[in-house]
A protein has these predicted regions:
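Intrinsically disordered, low-complexity proline-rich regions
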Residues: 1-18, 159, 186-205
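Short, conserved acidic/polar surface loops in the N-terminal third of protein domains
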Residues: 9, 82-84, 129
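C-terminal auxiliary extensions adjacent to catalytic cores
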Residues: 15-49, 56-64, 68, 167, ...
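Glycine-rich, flexible loop motifs
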Residues: 17-67, 94-152, 249, 281-282
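FAD-binding core of FAD-dependent oxidoreductases
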Residues: 71-93, 100-125, 151-175, 194, ...
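Acidic, glycine-rich active-site loops and adjacent beta-strand->loop/helix elements
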Residues: 77, 123-124, 144, 156-161, ...
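General N-terminal targeting signals
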Residues: 87-88, 94, 114, 134, ...
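Short helix-coil transition sites and intra-membrane helix breaks within transmembrane domains
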Residues: 129-130, 163, 379
Length: 534
């Protein structure tokens, strides 16, 4: 539960002080709280929970003192797993694990993604499966509270698991590597060169970095001394793919809602027959029934449709967006399994260390790929609707929605922008979780590439947002010049768009309108029929 300082509810939003959220059990650090931590919330770990984590840690260390070889603790890793380490080597081994494995580079995850990753890692540690200390869990919470955000590479993991990005994520605990710096921090080489890939990613204010050791000193924190197995535990599992999938899932659900709104405006503008949106057509499919119900609430009835059948892209809105929502649901289930399941290897279970396959994130990767494909299809269908809205035969409106067809070009290049975005999105829809590459001398001969699947989903969302903005702009213009009265359920959306888009009375650079819809219209969208809204 999130507590607020006394009187904070009466203060302006910018002045409110939020107290840390109390975590009394691993389950308290649920997806909703992880998203709030990503946005900046702090955590307070209950003393009883830390005591239980420490009890499990002591039991694990007792097994280590008297047991045989344990992978990554008293042995090497990967192809060197057969090498036993001396007691002296074991003392330095856990810190060393975070050194050479940090082979990634920029562009970095933004601060929210990085904070979500730390929160997921903390959630898995609080289960006790890792055998780490309560002090390590407390330090992770302190890093979140102090705003120390590691510089974690976005791409090129190439691991069975996530060892490379996790080495970057948790090296700063021990003063290794770099963290995202304040505005004016040291720029990265690609930043100085104007790297296009960074420009396409969400910008981090003053996106430079600073040495982790310097950041710790500036906050009065010592470098954390890793105990037995703690370096290896920090590199285990799939906390990155879990965090990225959770963040993209929230983005996808929000976007799907706006896609419904854009489709509703297009249906109204085209005067499409309403039969495909009838409740009877969704028998046996509760998800599609929800989509169709929200569409009906927006578009109402049309006693005089322009044609017996509208083009297919208008008729299939229910199945297309229902599939997007189902893909969100299945990805949400995969995230839940990753948060509650065993992802450590070896994991400390039933009083012994047990090698597991918890690092293999195919469940997350495959479902990220599925959602990317669903978004690609939805964007393709939306782009087809944009094209049809420019066609006077479909709408009865001036060709290309131009104020003066011929002297004015109209919105034809808005459709071409959408077509270009869809072309880029299709390339991202190739499943990232397929394609194995042997590493570590064949010891790691399989990867799931779940991290890459989550990154592909991020790109897909970016392109799908632009396509949706193109449809909103086109449908707005069509509704604006149509003699048909707008359905009552669509009027709040049209009023909102009218606040953003000036009347189109002649050709102009429509890219500016698309950017305005992206930056303003999609941020606070008045779609009153959101899923779950009643």
């Amino acid at each position: 539960m999130t507590e607020r300082a006394e009187g904070a509810s009466k203060a302006p939003r910018s002045e409110r002080v939020t107290l840390p959220s109390l975590v009394a059990s691993p389950e308290d650090l649920d997806p909703g709280l992880i998203l709030r931590v990503a946005a900046g919330d702090r955590l307070q770990l209950a003393p009883a929970l830390l005591a239980e984590v420490q009890r499990r840690c002591e039991a694990a260390r007792e097994v280590l003192r008297h047991g045989g070889p344990v992978y990554g603790v008293n042995t090497g890793m990967g192809a060197l797993a057969g090498v036993r380490l001396s007691e002296a080597e074991q003392l330095a081994h856990q810190r060393n694990l975070l050194l050479a494995r940090a082979s990634g580079g920029p562009p970095w995850l933004d601060a929210a993604d990085a904070r979500a990753l730390i929160a997921v890692r903390l959630r898995t540690f609080l289960s006790g499966d890792s055998g780490v200390s309560g002090a390590l869990c407390q330090r992770l919470a302190e890093l979140l509270g102090q705003g120390i955000v590691p510089a974690i590479p976005r791409a090129a993991a190439g691991c069975a698991g996530e060892i490379t990005p996790l080495a970057h994520a948790f090296g700063p605990l021990a003063g290794i590597g770099r963290v995202l710096g304040p505005p004016g921090g040291e720029p990265e080489p690609h930043e100085r060169a104007g790297d296009a890939q960074l420009a396409a990613a969400p910008a981090q204010p003053g996106a430079g970095t600073m040495p982790a050791a310097e950041a710790l000193r500036s906050r009065g924190l010592a470098e954390f001394a890793l105990g037995p197995r703690e370096g290896h535990a920090l590199l285990a599992g799939v906390p990155g793919a879990t965090a990225l999938a959770l963040r993209r899932l929230a983005d996808a659900r929000a976007l799907e809602s706006v896609m419904e709104a854009a489709a509703a405006l297009s249906i109204a503008a085209a005067g499409a027959a309403r039969d495909p949106y009838a409740a009877a057509g969704a028998r046996g499919d509760a998800v599609m029934a929800g989509v169709l119900g929200r569409l009906r609430a927006a578009i109402g009835d049309d006693p005089e449709p322009r044609a017996l059948q509208a083009p297919v892209s208008f008729r299939v809105v229910g199945p297309v967006l229902g599939h997007v929502l189902r893909a969100c649901d299945t990805l949400e289930s995969a995230v839940g399994r990753a948060l509650s399941g065993v992802t450590d290897s070896p994991a400390f279970l039933d009083g012994r260390f047990l090698g597991t396959a918890g690092f293999h994130g195919i469940d997350l990767g495959a479902h990220c790929d599925q959602l990317t494909a669903a978004l690609a299809h939805a964007a393709e269908v939306a782009t087809a609707r944009v094209h049809r809205l420019l066609d006077a035969r479909v709408t009865g409106l001036p060709a290309q929605l131009a104020p003066r067809p011929g002297p004015d070009t109209g919105l034809v290049t808005v459709h071409k922008r959408a077509a270009g975005e869809v072309h880029a999105l299709r390339r991202l829809a190739v499943p990232a979780s397929i394609g194995l590459i042997e590493t570590s001398g064949g010891q790691e001969d399989v990867q799931s590439f779940a991290w890459e699947s989550a990154e592909a989903l991020r790109g897909a969302l970016r392109h799908a947002h632009v396509v949706t903005a193109c449809e909103l702009l086109t449908a707005f213009q069509a509704c604006s010049i149509s003699q048909r009265p707008a359905p009552a359920g669509c009027r709040p959306m049209l009023r909102r768009l009218a606040e953003i888009i000036a009347p189109i009375e002649a050709d102009r650079p429509f890219g500016e309108d698309i950017e305005a819809v992206l930056s303003e219209g999609l941020r606070s969208w008045p779609w009153p029929f959101r899923p779950g809204a009643g």
